[in-house]
Amino acid sequence: GVYKFSMAISPLDCMGCGVCTHVCPVGALTMQPLESQEDQQPVFDYMVAKVAEKKELQDFTVKGSQFRQPMLEFSGSCAGCAETSYARLVTQLFGDRMYISNATGCSSIWGGPGATSPYCTDKNGHGPAWCNSLFEDNAEHGFGMYVGQEKIREDLMSKTEQLIAIEWTQPALKEAAQKWLNTKDDGNANAEATKEYVAALQANIATVDELAAVPKFAEHAAELKAKGEKFCDCDACKLVAEILDKKDYLSKKSVWIFGGDGWAYDIGYGGLDHILASGRNVKVLVMDTE
């Protein structure tokens, strides 16, 4: 094959629960004293620093998901905790465009301990956006996150349509804008379309200095510069600037509500029932440990 496969384990981060040795169907792992495994730490560090994801191996199958970067790591949860296994898998599938509203409970303790976060980012700085409100209003809190970003995105769609309609908008920008609109409801396709759209927006906004280089616009450029403006104020450039200001909301988000059975089945049930009945595209992960 093209690639070789290896699993590197971080000895310094092992919780010592032994679950991996029990569930491995071929008995490939055994528990060993920490001091006998310390020479394996540089191997793990090398893998993290040097080995990149292989996009051609990734898909939404069980096997394919495991070739994707986990965006939940070293949480400090209890040894053998199953909650982090499920949460980690969700981040492998949707983490680079994920919003999480987390009910107070175990998952908010390992998920948001003071001064640190187990949720991480990829090489592009993209990763789960996590927030914890209270115990009883988690569903409403997550719903608010969804509706808020949806409203901003609807505004960006309107501005994009206006930008396409302007006669002097560059053809390449119009093409990227239309591709973004066409894929707006497809999370995977829209991720790539968003990258292309942002690049086209950044390449097609005229700065005041560029405007000043055109003789017929030189006087107007000087007026803009005196006001402290950085960009051309034509209708197209104003729309481009407004869209770029909210570029983090362009990609389709995957909004999740995390919580335990005490929240979902008891104190927060009324809110959860209301949110699910709304029909909005909000996902819920209930960690039932009762």
Which sequence ranges carry the predicted segments?
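N-terminal leader/propeptide and maturation segments of large enzyme subunits in energy/redox metabolism
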Residues: 134-193, 243
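Iron-sulfur cluster-binding cysteine motifs and their immediate structural context
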Residues: 1-2, 6-10, 15, 19-37, ...
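Glycine- and acidic
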Residues: 2-9, 66-77, 136-142, 253-257
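Mobile "lid/hinge" segments at catalytic clefts and subdomain interfaces of large enzymes
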Residues: 112-150, 286-290
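Amphipathic alpha-helical binding modules
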Residues: 215-242
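Ferredoxin-type iron-sulfur electron-transfer modules in oxidoreductases and energy-metabolism complexes
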Residues: 1-7, 34-65, 69, 97, ...
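Thiamine diphosphate
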Residues: 84-89, 99, 109-121, 196, ...
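N-terminal amphipathic, basic-rich helices that act as targeting or association modules
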Residues: 64, 72-104, 108-114
